[in-house]
Amino acid sequence: DFSIKAKNIRNNQHEGNDFGDFVKVLKGKLIRELYTLQMLSAYHLAFAQNACNFSVPGSGKTSIVYGAYAYLNSLPPEHNKFVDRLLVVGPIASFAPWEIEYKECFGHSTTIRRMVGVDARNRMLHFYSSERTEITLISYQSLAASQKDVVTFLKREKVMVVLDEAHKIKNVDGGLWSESHLSSAPYARSRVILTGTPAPNGYQDLFNLYRFVWPQKRIIRFPVHYLINLSTDRTASAKEKVKELVDDISPFFMRIKKSDLNLPEPIYHPPKLVEMGKTQQIIYDYIERKYIDYFEKEASIGGFTEKLKSAKLIRLIQCATNPNLLNKPLDDYLSEIGISSSLGIDDREIMQMIKGYYKEEIPAKYIEIAQLIKNIISRKGPDGKVVVWAIHICNMHDLQCYLHSQGIPSELLYGAVPNEEDDTDDNIITREKIIRQFLFCKLAHNVIIANPFAVG
């Protein structure tokens, strides 16, 4: 029975020489050596042909897929499992690993087409073209817009379709993306789901994943509304139904847990304490005294003290980082970050104090950051890379200017840098492009000053 054998493979219980033969094929096809659980996951996927991988980030899901693809591609062309094309659907930010890891896995390049900045007509021409492109990378949005062309492509070619970050199709309410991918599924030779978070909202999230992987089978026997209720039901009977659900889906997925990765213990670097410069300390002390006076005067007004505490904290953080941030009135700053600016604080006196700050000194943190960067790059060599996290936009620009003055060029990554979209011109600098070039040593600079909210 197929399900039993798939489950046995999942549990590392394989019979005969099939697994050994699989390993031999991969050793001949791949230059990257898969570790034990990756090899088992690739074998499970190759056997099942249609399966999910719910492994955690960093477990090598891309390599696992390439391993399964390599084996299926090694079969005779007339074999019903043979594939020779990959259609990877995912967010644009997920494309780079597929491009880079192909060469790392196989030891050579191949024909890859990135469907970014490609209009509908050229997408159609690609899917109807007789020219062979081994790997096509396309976003969920573009695939939904080209559904008919994709179906024709899948009918004509022997394609493994991979949905990367497949939570995009979890919508069980008939969303356009979900329906487009589900209606294309029956025409793929092989179907793969990749996501590290298969059911964040409840068991109903699994429904479309398994409809895609096995469109002709009813892997999940429960209707969506039942799965929704099952997610919150804590009764004994519900627990039995959950066990049935897990038993039904378990032959068709693999999951490598974080504990399986044998990762080394993280290296903890204690924070560096940097003393403020003389002028910076004077401004800091002034702000602290100023707001203590406000607390005493306005303590009787309900809620006002808490607002003032927040305002004081913001100002002290700004000052401790870079007094130049104080050039912007507090009301403007609060409004910019979405906090009510009706605090009635008069900033005029402090504004006069800080206007000439840069004539007096450089923020002590900047000096320390520059030295840390120089130390890291000197240790790591030309491939050394440094990310400096920063919140305030003004601070990012000021730090970049200071680093430049110290011979350290850098790139900014924050909200003003556009995201990459399907119709983005190749000449436009985007967040994804900066990250790709930085990761793979194609960026002119090896320092990025980044706002975490822009890259998360």
Model-derived features: positions:
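Charged, low-complexity
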Residues: 1-51, 110, 133-135, 139-142, ...
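Conserved Walker A/P-loop ATP-binding site and its immediately adjacent core
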Residues: 64, 82-104, 205, 391-394
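Conserved Helicase C-terminal RecA-like lobe
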Residues: 64, 69, 263-280, 303-448, ...
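Conserved helix-turn-beta segment of the N-terminal RecA-like "Helicase ATP-binding" lobe
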Residues: 94-118, 216
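Conserved helix/coil segment N-terminal to the catalytic DExD/H
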Residues: 121-132, 140-157
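Walker B catalytic acidic pair
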Residues: 164-165
